[in-house]
Amino acid sequence: MGYAILSFQQVRLASGTLKLGKKRSLAEKTAAVFTLVKALIQEHGVQEVAMEEFFYHKDPRALARISHCRGAAMAAAALEGIPVFEYSPMDVKKAVVGYGHATKEQVAWMLRQTFSLPD
C-alpha cells in the first residue's frame, strides 16, 4: 500500500509503502494499515484524506482484502475527524498525468518526476 502526504502547494511532506507481507493474517494487515494511517494523520496534521475508488478485480478474495484495508484507512481518518474523499481511477490518472487512460507506468513516472521520488 502506497501513501503520500502532500501540502496544498503540491509539496511532498512524506511518502512510502507499507509492505503487508504474505505471512500476516488479514487482521494483522488491517491493523497495520489502521495504525499507519492514524500515525501519519497525527504526525503531519492531515486535514483531508484522498483515496482511489474501487476498481473491478478479477479475484474476489483480493477485492475483499483490498476492501478491508481501505476500510481500516477510512476508519482511522474518521476517528480523527478527517474527511475522506474518493476519486475514480480515471480522475486520478487525469489529475496526475493529464490523461484519464494513462498506464500505471505513466502515472508512476509522473509521480516520481513531480515529487522527486526514487525509481
Language model: regions and residue ranges:
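Phosphate- and other anionic-substrate recognition elements at nucleic-acid/protein interfaces
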Residues: 1-119
